[in-house]
Design a protein with these regions (language model features):
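Helical scaffold of the NTase/Pol beta-like nucleotidyltransferase catalytic core
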Residues: 1-52
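Non-catalytic N-terminal targeting/anchoring module and adjacent flexible stem/linker
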Residues: 1-2, 86-90, 204-207
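Catalytic cores of NTP-dependent nucleotidyl/adenyl transfer enzymes across multiple folds
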Residues: 7-17, 28, 32, 120-207
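Metal-dependent nucleotidyltransferase catalytic core
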Residues: 27-34, 76-103, 108-109
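Active-site nucleotide-donor binding segment shared across nucleotidyl transfer reactions
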Residues: 39-72
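Catalytic metal-binding acidic patch
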Residues: 63-83, 150
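Residues that flank catalytic or metal-binding motifs in active/ligand-binding sites
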Residues: 68-72, 103-105, 112-115, 142, ...
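Conserved catalytic core of nucleotide-sugar-dependent glycosyltransferases
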Residues: 104-129
Length: 207
């Protein structure tokens, strides 16, 4: 069954590939080729993107991909989602195929059996969210650069603090099968302040 992605250049049809954790281990050589190709393509655009999750963790801690990782993780500002989709045909020129597309959250491309996940982070209260991953604004405030495979890649501001936020204070210790944990900080925060906001509203209304 084919899926359809609507772009400014027309409809793009593709057959989705079933991707899931535990399917395989990353091939570092092929993944390196892919991430360098991706950098070359995106560096010619104004798309806001960068390394995140396990790819950023590996770049800082191992100076390489994590041996038990499975893919490449990239964040994209949700506002730039359509710009990424418009690059599908450009990705095709370099041998990438579309593997999956979840309209509001995730887009994946694959080349030589190694895939890249693009996470669309949408503006929320005090931060950005994709799926169940919430990241405070301070990490998106200014993009930073990190040297990876002798090239500079964009990433989150204050990357070491972000990794502590995402993985805990022991993020420097390698752990097999330890993935970025979804967090629901923003939900808890809203629930905690909501009663106060309601009380303030009623006070303002009645005085």
């Amino acid at each position: 069954m084919q899926n359809i992605i609507k772009t400014s250049k027309g409809e793009y049809k593709f057959k989705p590939i079933n991707l899931f954790h535990g399917k395989k281990k990353i091939n570092k050589k092929k993944a390196r080729e892919n991430i360098l190709l991706l950098r070359d393509i995106l560096s010619k655009t104004d798309i806001r993107w960068g390394l995140i999750f396990g790819t950023l963790l590996g770049a800082i801690r191992e100076k390489n991909f994590i041996v038990h990782d499975e893919d490449i993780d990239i964040y994209i500002f949700y506002e730039d989602k359509d710009k990424i989709l418009d690059l599908i045909y450009e990705f095709n020129k370099f041998g990438f195929d579309v593997a999956r597309y979840e309209k509001k959250s995730l887009f994946s491309i694959i080349r030589n059996n190694e895939y890249i996940d693009f996470y669309f982070f949408k503006k929320k209260l005090f931060g950005r969210r994709c799926l169940d991953y919430y990241i405070p604004n301070l990490f998106f405030k200014n993009s930073a650069k990190i040297k990876f495979f002798n090239q500079y890649f964009p990433t989150l501001n204050n990357a070491h603090k972000y990794l502590e936020f995402q993985y805990g204070k022991d993020w420097k210790v390698p752990k097999i099968n330890s993935h970025a944990k979804p967090n629901i900080f923003w939900k808890k925060f809203i629930k905690s302040i909501f009663p106060s906001l309601v009380a303030i509203y009623h006070y303002w209304k009645n005085n």
